[in-house]
Amino acid sequence: MSAATETEVREFQTEVSQLLDLMIHALYSNKEIFLRELISNASDANDKLRFAGLSDDSLFEGDSELTIKLEFDKEAGTFSIMDNGIGMSRDEVISNIGTIAKSGTKEFFKSLTGDQQRDAHLIGQFGVGFYSSFIVADKVTLETRKAGAGAEQGVRWISAGDGSYTLENMEKAERGTRITLHMREDEKEFLDAWRLRSIVRKFSDHVTWPVKMLEELPPAPPAKEGEEPEPPKTPEWETVNKASALWTLSKNDITEDEYKEFYKHVGHDFEDPMEWVHARMEGRMEYTLLLYIPGRAPFDLWDRDRRGGLKLFVRRVFIMDTSEELLPRYLRFVRGVIDSADLPLNVSREILQQNRQVEAIKKGLVHKVLGMLEEMLKNDPEKYATFWKEFGMVLKEGMIEDFANKERIAKLCRFSTTHDGERVPKIALADYVERMKEGQEAIYYVTGESFEACSSSPHLEIFRKKGIEVLLLSDRVDEWTVTHLTEFDGKPLQAITKGELDLSKFAGGEEEAKDEEAEKAQEEALKPITERMAKVLEGQVKEVRLSHRLTESPACLVGDAHDMSATLERLLKEAGQEVPTAKRILEINPSHALLKRLADEADEEKFGELTHVLHDQALLAEGGQLKDPSQFVKRLNKLLMG
């Protein structure tokens, strides 16, 4: 490298500067987490070296005892943490520390609210890691060398967290990373052995690598008269944490607080988990699992490139962060550890995707997670309601992805319905089936782009009048869910916006079932109107017919029984897919005053204007978009002015 590039001053990426500013303010009340974050990073560096060393033991450079060391200097006002892990090259320092090279960054900043407590949670989820140093330090120096690189390839990084950093080459004999924090004047409390030890034991007791500090020696006794004073003893490094893999211990030997703190380490979260399951699986496959459900949904839950939430170990050796290989996507919110006794140490992602043993583990993990949710639902419905609020929309994807567990997942799902009219989904499909009217053969549902669009749909009118419950499905995933969950408990799911509808066998209020002959007579009498309307709307609709589902609205649009729903059509088009626009059926309410006006309208131009407005209103009522809104407004104004 040329001398000109040996030392350089670089600007932080804009997002890093924003994050530093946000973090210092939002996390100040929880500032001791800086040590947990730095220990967690050091632990990851050791994990990576241990894994890389399986295939190239020269990377250990003759020292395979991996540790994390802490030291402080009260006089200098500094705290340092050292690991002898994988280390970083100059380019890696720039990409890992000078920029935020992770997906979901924009979504993260959009999700910040200004509420310190909520933002602290989000910042914690984002993974502040190294940047947490600036909560307590006004200057940070990082010195690192990549394992296997020459001593002259060391790198020094220095910043005061003010928008820029200095990068320079250095000689570094030992591989790994040393981070030195120049503590702020009001943060000198952390330059204390007892304080540091207590934080390590609180947050990092079960980090798998020994966290060491120099032992504290009592002052040497004064020399007796005429005797030489004793030479000062050299303090030894002593391990502060238990350095045991928590998941390998018996459940009876682990406290609730230890489970919670381990989650914060492995899940990179600041908050307690909602629930967890810890089990040792034996038989054909032997593995241990410790799985957690977070307290809140992460901001990047919908990001397909997000980091895996599971850490895979083989006989306590960390292999990789993974997710999809061991859990289906609909359980991507799960965090935790899997430790296999049977997988090879050199396992790769490709092997994971093709390995039968991995399939067996995956099946076992799904069984455990669904079992944990079933237990939560049974024993703590309030907690399950919180789970559903945070992760329900993702769990619904399981009915699409996991055919084997479709029924089991369906029983865990909660829905909004016309029964209580509440936005918060509380109703189970089993509850719906139990309340079905005598003679009701289908589970009825309506889909829409919002709860309001569903609950105010004109298609619901006859169902409300007859007291028949309807599921209100407004989550984006619902359109795909109902194409896969076609029945529940032997009852088919039926969209109320498609196909012919005959609810005449159900009386509603004082209404008696209509005589079939009377209905035919009414259809015949109104045939001239439906034919005139169909002519006006030629090319826009399949047909115009009398409705059996409207009681208040003048018209609605419906599809044939096997047509794609209007909502799904819109979603696919928004996703950039070419979807042929299906012509809908316009159903009109023969009892509505507007239909009587249409019947009396002799002026064909006015009849046409009224028909178009009626059609456009029906389209708007179901959440659709008009091709020509200005034309609709002109027609409406014209009719209003008589």
Swiss-Prot record:
It comes from the Bacteria. InterPro entries: HATPase_C_sf, Heat_shock_protein_90_CS, HSP90_C, Hsp90_fam, Hsp90_N, Ribosomal_Su5_D2-typ_SF. One of its GO terms (molecular function) is ATP binding. It is found in: Cytoplasm. Residues 224-236 have a biased composition (Basic and acidic residues). It holds the Pfam family HATPase_c_3. Homodimer. This is Chaperone protein HtpG. It comes from Magnetococcus marinus (strain ATCC BAA-1437 / JCM 17883 / MC-1).
